[in-house]
Amino acid sequence: MSESKRGGAQLARAVEKAYQAGQDDYHLEPMVLVENGKPVGKIGDGDAAVFCCRRGEREIELTELFTDPDFNKVQRNQLKDLDFVIMTMYHDKFKDLPIAFAPSHVVKPLAQVLSEAGKNQFHCAESEKYAHVTFFFNGGENAPFPGEDDVCVPSPKGIDFDQQPELSLPAVADQVMGALGKYDFVVTNFANGDVIGHTLNTAAKLEACKHVSHYLDVVVHDALAKGYVVAVTADHGNIEKLYTAAGKPDGAHTTNLVPFILMDPAHSGPIALRDGCLGDVAPTVLNVMGIPQPAEMTGKSLAEGHDFGKDRKMLLIICDGWGLGSGDDGDAIHLADTPYWDSLLAEQSWSKLHASGEHVGLGSGKAGNSEAGHSNLGAGRCVMQDDVRLDAAVKDGSFKKNPIFLQAIEHAKKNGTALHLLAYLTYKSSHGCIDYPLAICEMARDAGLDRVFFHIIFDGRSTEPGSAPKLLAELDEKLDAIGVGRIVDGVGRGV
């Protein structure tokens, strides 16, 4: 690859050397463009920066690094007069930052309806998925509703997740069983299907499936013995698909349907269930518990014809990244030793739910993700996701008129400084898309700002393994066509 004034070729060579040293895209160590012994494109006083990612998960910590004066997890210099823009509101602690696409609030999510009905509730997950059973499940609310207790179990630290495929599931199961009998509603997330599904380690995936099956057995039996109606479902697919069409290990989300299993210990016969989508789960919970469904919830109960009686309690288990696969040698759940899971499908009442694309407020044909999944599960309706709002803005031209972006560009122009774009190098991740920073780069060019620096986050999940050099070459060409912009550093998203 030849030298490039845009920096992509230089970064691509560094990536290829990292591959030779055994690194992959997800775990690429930081690499920086250097000229005359100095790093190029450092963020400095008076600059503007746009975090071109749309999810409120890993983005939170990096935003804290730049904006929170009390952040102390790493040593850093506090920059003066930095205009730091976030694409969406990753957390309500950032509500006073400039937000390009501020959230539309979910009115009357399940947790609020339960609270207003006088029911107490328990939300529990390990830290990798804690935000999903709280912030996302609760419609964007960070604070628990009255009567709601939230427990976060730390995920393993200092070790690659595929080396501990059970993650912290044993501790999560213990917390859930400790809550059963004390709360009217319990929701939990079993993270393994997604977290281990994102790795490329087939043996670890099979082991993860085994652990999920085992702890489903333990927790479900305890809940049924205590009189709880139990639902087991998923937020999207992932671990069930081991290989890409080219036969390579696959760590990406899928568009597969997900199961909805419902068990009522007070009823020995089958429960008539219909197929539906994730937005039908919250209405089902309300149906089970005998609580009127608010008009804001447009989903419908999946078990409308079943008489659950009065004063019922319910456990909802969300198996993250646990889709209905092909049932062959390319399906991890099928291959794994999962006797209890197999018995659920063989002996219990269950239906199929849509968990991707327009059914959960994503773009047509797009794989589901944890944020969309949990927001739909908790909202009881289809919740329009950020990628649809953003893509619509790009399509109708309003993206390039966004006043928050224009203010950031003007800030850099006024100070005679630079605009920095923090961006995922991918076209289809639920975290973001390289098209967003490219559009902002064009805006900067049109406004007469030529100092624009790209800070790349290598995805390693939605992209093919080893594809970073090719994607960097494509980005180089696009920046050449725009006429401004330089790629100055990169790091894997898992570092």
Predicted region positions:
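Feature captures the catalytic ectodomains and active-site-proximal regions of enzymes
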Residues: 1-495
